Curated annotation (Swiss-Prot):
Ranges for region Disordered: 624-704
Binding site for ATP: 217-224
UniProt cross-references to Pfam families, sorted A to Z: AAA, AAA_lid_3, FtsH_ext, Peptidase_M41
Name the UniProt record assigns to this protein: ATP-dependent zinc metalloprotease FtsH
Binding positions for Zn(2+) per the UniProt entry: 439, 443, 515
Topology of this chain in the membrane: Multi-pass membrane protein
Length: 704
């Protein structure tokens, strides 16, 4: 992959294209020259005119030509004029076989002064060659042109060459200073850079350079940005390529490109290779719809050989990124190939604040904007989400004609990123507004009455995204896990909207469908993955992978019996019934608070945390739940006496709501669609689906 010559504009020259153009120009010039100078000076006349000349006395010499063209060339004693056109003294006419005898007789009768002769016509060798091979040359040129365009130009027959791009040192650099919220990953990658810059320091103590570094984590957390920072920091060749660039429709191309890429890196060592989205080529062998011997697996096999074939001090490091580490082939992940596997997770409060500070550069913020407060509201957001928040705030500010980004723009930007844009055009009837207000009020009231729920920070009945209204329950700090009581509280306030509809309106709409789906998913996770059911027991009944990998699960039998599946269903139903009972109890005991909340919602449409706290002052809290032990045969011990203060079971935390780590129950985006019922409206309004949880954002949001 040697660097190609470049034009002043920076585009690669195409040597084969230039050669082809010169060949075409030469052919055209040759044809033009032949057309202009290939004639012998004779002018064409009609057959009748030729016979009339032979019958006269002006013919000085004649030549009868036979072969692939039958004609007579005449040399005259005076110019022949065809009307106003002077044909000169050299003319010719053609004839057909039927006139052959008559033409010969006419020539003999004319008895030219210099006589006549016969000749067999033959083409010149070069014109014959040109006419024979010109169509073939045109076809080859057209084919070459099409292939060059299909392969990006200039690489018609280089299918097996790597498509990796060499980092341009003249381009604007991304450095480690531009990466925020991933301090551990930056530290690890900075050490990789030091390996390449000063390998002797590490080799002196017997350390071996890592052969591979795998960056994994959810989308938007900055894996590719980290690779760009390595490219900007390292003063060594940096080759970047996507995993999908290895596999083409031609068999063997992927393996050939892998060989070419690694050979080029070795020739220019020390060097770094970066493969983005490596799961496109490195997924588990023997799985998927392509079978066990497809082109992708051949490419993976070649990559395994190249990684394991590095010499000890080759000074070539492979960095790869993926958000599906669970489907990568085990041989790719073993030590000796990817020696370091660095998780890039969603940032904590400090990381979010740093990220906001990086992306706030160049944006005019109002003096009262507190980025730390924004970071606290953005629990669970990735770096890409936070960058999008500030960009949306800037767009909203420009749209409104202002010059300064204020707190209102940031607040709206967070809601747009979390829930989607507000739907100003959606018209709701008074009955629908009332039902939406009571439904969202039910969610908020139950959340406020629970002992382990995060604070309710916002309730609105304004349609946004796919929801007709929503309730935000946001923790005040980052959490690494959740207790059983915290999850039970989430189930309870998830059922709050359903409980309000059934208890107050004496009817249930299709609106709570998403609530039921989310609550069922949480309950099933508690029973099947977390061992939070005394009936089912402390077993993990789900597979090792949370996400389906098509082909890997095909043909696999369930890991539990039908009786166990029935028991799981019963336990899930029990958890949801208990949650509905708790929500119902809260609504009955706090009906006056609910009515006051609905009245404020109908008047203001949106209530913030301070206004909600004022309304919820009189809420009657639920009593703490009984201590839960998986088996009554096991004794309960005293609360912890070492390592800090701990409240009694049932009041563990008022800052719940953070997704479980490392495998949280995946919750749908707020405002999921409800069941498609003929004649029923959709889109989150009464009669349509639309309550949800924003588990991915680290907040619980119920949306109608």
């Amino acid at each position: 992959m040697a660097d190609s010559a470049k034009t002043p504009r920076g585009k690669k020259r195409r040597p084969f294209t230039g050669l082809a153009l010169w060949i075409i120009v030469a052919l055209l010039l040759g044809m033009a020259m032949f057309s202009l100078f290939g004639r012998d000076g004779y002018q064409q006349i009609d057959t009748q005119q030729g016979l009339e000349l032979l019958a006269g006395d002006t013919v000085e010499q004649a030549k009868i030509i036979d072969g692939n063209q039958q004609r007579v060339d005449l040399v005259l004693t005076e110019d022949f004029k065809d009307g106003d056109e002077d044909k000169g003294t050299q003319v010719r006419f053609s004839y057909v076989d039927a006139r052959g005898d008559a033409v010969v007789q006419a020539v003999e009768d004319a008895a030219p002064a210099k006589g006549y002769t016969d000749e067999i016509a033959s083409s010149s060798w070069w014109s014959t060659l040109l006419l024979s091979f010109l169509p073939l040359l045109i076809f080859i040129g057209l084919f070459w042109f099409l292939i060059m365009n299909a392969q990006g130009g200039g690489k018609a027959m280089q299918f097996g060459k790597s498509k990796a791009k060499l980092f341009n040192k003249e381009a604007p650099k991304v450095t480690f200073a531009d990466v925020a919220g991933a301090d551990e990953a930056v530290e690890e990658l900075d050490e990789i850079k030091q390996f390449l810059v000063d390998p002797g320091r590490y080799q002196a103590v017997g350390a071996k350079i890592p052969k591979g570094v795998l960056l994994y984590g959810p989308p938007g957390t900055g894996k590719t940005l980290l690779a760009k920072a390595v490219a900007g920091e390292a003063n060594v060749p940096f080759y970047s390529i996507s995993g999908s660039d290895f596999v083409e429709m031609f068999v063997g191309v992927g393996a050939s490109r892998v060989r070419d890429l690694f050979n080029t890196a070795k020739e220019n060592a020390p060097a770094i290779i970066f493969i983005d989205e490596i799961d496109a080529v490195g997924r588990h062998r023997g799985a998927g719809m392509g079978g066990g011997h497809d082109e992708r697996e051949q490419t993976l096999n070649q990559m395994l050989v190249e990684m394991d074939g590095f010499e000890e001090n080759q000074n070539v490091i492979l960095i790869a990124a993926t958000n599906r580490v669970d489907i990568l082939d085990p041989a790719l992940l073993r030590p000796g190939r990817f020696d370091r596997q660095i998780g890039v997770e969603a940032p904590d409060l400090k990381g979010r604040l740093h990220i906001l500070g990086v992306h706030a550069k160049g944006k005019p913020l109002a003096h009262d904007v507190d980025l730390e407060a924004v970071a606290k509201r953005a629990i669970g957001m990735s770096g890409a989400d936070l960058a999008n928040v500030l960009n949306e705030a800037a767009l909203l500010t420009a749209r409104s004609g202002n010059q300064i980004i204020d707190n209102r723009a940031l607040d709206e930007a967070i809601d747009r990123v979390s829930m989607g844009p507000q739907r100003y055009s959606k018209v709701m009837t008074e009955r629908e507004r009332q039902m939406t207000a009571y439904h969202e009020g039910g969610h908020a009231l139950v959340a406020a009455a629970m002992n382990n729920s995060a604070p309710v920070t916002k309730v609105t009945i304004l349609p946004r995204g796919r929801a007709g209204g929503y309730t935000m329950v946001v923790p005040t700090q980052d959490r690494n896990y959740q207790s059983r009581n915290e999850l039970l509280d989430r189930l309870a306030y998830a059922m709050g909207g359903y409980a309000v509809e059934e208890s107050i309106f004496h009817d249930v709409t299709t609106g709570p469908s998403s609530d039921l789906q989310n609550a069922t998913k949480i309950a099933r996770t508690m029973v099947m993955q977390l061992g939070m059911s005394g009936t089912v027991g402390q077993v993990a009944l789900s597979g090792e992978q949370d996400e389906v990998f098509v082909g890997m699960q095909q043909g696999q039998a369930p890991r539990f019996s039908a009786e166990t599946a029935s028991l799981v269903d019963q336990e899930v139903r029990t958890l949801l019934d208990n949650a509905l009972d708790e929500a119902w109890s809260v609504i009955v005991e706090n009906r006056h608070v609910l009515d006051r909340l609905v009245e404020e919602l109908l008047e203001k449409e949106t209530l913030n945390e301070r206004e909600l706290a004022q309304i919820f002052r009189d809420v009657k809290k639920q009593p703490p739940r009984e201590v839960w032990i998986s088996s009554t045969e096991r004794p309960s011990l005293a609360a912890p006496s070492v390592g800090g203060t701990t409240t009694a079971t049932g009041t563990e935390s008022h800052d719940a709501g953070e997704p479980l780590q490392p495998n949280p129950p995946e919750l749908p985006h707020p405002g999921g669609e409800g069941p498609q019922i003929p004649g029923a409206p959709h889109g989150g309004e009464p009669g349509g689906g639309g309550y949800g949880y924003d588990g991915s954002a680290g907040t619980d949001g119920t949306g109608r």
